[in-house]
């Protein structure tokens, strides 16, 4: 008897390696040969709970067993497999909801790069639409504080559809075996009905890999933007913590806290924690999770190492971007190129890929990437810190306009990532401009509802009150209800106001070390009153422009 060992996609590499070793010993005792390919095998033993969708298994006898039970009693499991192997039946890759009637059970997951705005706004949109249809729905949010409203095993089992609206990689292993549809938070928020229509047509059984989704998802979510946003999402807490610690340390310079006794060395300690550790780690974590998004877990270690090399060399965020993509695609390429016997396959992700990847990418970073990129970042930092007032105003206007063009979309995130990345190079003026501009659209919409109340419906006026609060918290997406109703006019007025706020902030050389927080981090701005003035002027510009160009017919 010839036996081939394999496992479900959700079984970890280390566990798979241990199972293979245990069953190799059990097979030797039972005089069963372990072979390296399904084609050679008389029986295929699958560890896990989901059969792999593998055409090589067609025509083979298979036996599937949970990995925990298999590990406890390998001899008994092997005997059962030899006696009870059944013909392989491939799992269906698509699900038809034709004829499904009555109350549907929907579970959903939402996640965005910052884990703040789109995560929760799309969750509300999904929940509202599902309840309107009379469905049972539960939405799990994967924000910066972790999973909220967590979906239970029982709820997964009862679900008719798993609806995933995520702009970054999120763990979905608990949904294996269920019909799943993937989309972005933006589409789930703005086109909820259309996305659910597509979900019921295009959902596929999720087997723990990357099979669930749509053609659109493959184009949009697997590209550069998704990889970058995965890195940004994991980097942000480090930037926030590091920036605020540095800002707090400055309080001692102004005798806000008495700088004596036990506090004497505290400023230097805080700066060391913020700048010496957090800011160095931010580039490594960013690169690590970019690589993780591309090559999964084998890419993480290589990306972290490459990112730390970029950070130590002074290559900044540009070096981190290159390090992350280089590490990810090198590891992904090695994974495809390197072919090993079945007995050694489990060593590839935990030994061979990290070792070869770290060596190749590390040496490439040290000798080819870091020297020129570090020089570029040095010149860029010098230019940004010594630029004239006119250049500063122009750059501020560009950053401000980009922050307001799509409010949480790719252009917005490009400007935001650029500004956040420069914090690691001790350049803080772009971050101040980006945050000021990002606060403008929602506050500007509130101003417009005050100025031209007769042009807005009662519900829009109420939305204006909510958008004001969101704007103060630096949540640009607070303006999205207005964008959905009147996109061209809202975007034009928002871009004008954002450019004004960004230009004023950069022109006044205002700095900010914290990348998020809105009104709550104003005390850590170099010029708080001037900064509030820049935001107010920008919001007023947006509000006045929109109040003028908005059509009365739009409110009907």
UniProtKB/Swiss-Prot annotation:
Q: What triggers production of this protein?
A: By fructose.
Phosphocysteine, modified sites: 112
Where does the sequence pass through the membrane?
237-257, 275-295, 302-322, 324-344, 349-369, 390-410, 431-451, 468-488, 490-510, 529-549
Superkingdom, according to UniProt? Bacteria
- Enzyme type, top EC level: transferase
GO annotation terms (biological process)? phosphoenolpyruvate-dependent sugar phosphotransferase system
Q: Which CDD domains match?
A: PTS_IIB_fructose
Regarding the membrane, this protein is recorded as:
Multi-pass membrane protein
By its UniProt entry, which PANTHER family does this protein fall under?
A: FRUCTOSE-LIKE PERMEASE, FRUCTOSE-LIKE PTS SYSTEM EIIBC COMPONENT-RELATED
Its function?
Answer: The phosphoenolpyruvate-dependent sugar phosphotransferase system (sugar PTS), a major carbohydrate active transport system, catalyzes the phosphorylation of incoming sugar substrates concomitantly with their translocation across the cell membrane. The enzyme II FruAB PTS system is involved in fructose transport.
NCBIfam families assigned to the protein according to its UniProt record, in alphabetical order: FRU, PTS_IIC_fructo
Q: What is this protein called?
A: PTS system fructose-specific EIIB'BC component
Q: Give the organism the record lists.
A: Haemophilus influenzae (strain ATCC 51907 / DSM 11121 / KW20 / Rd)
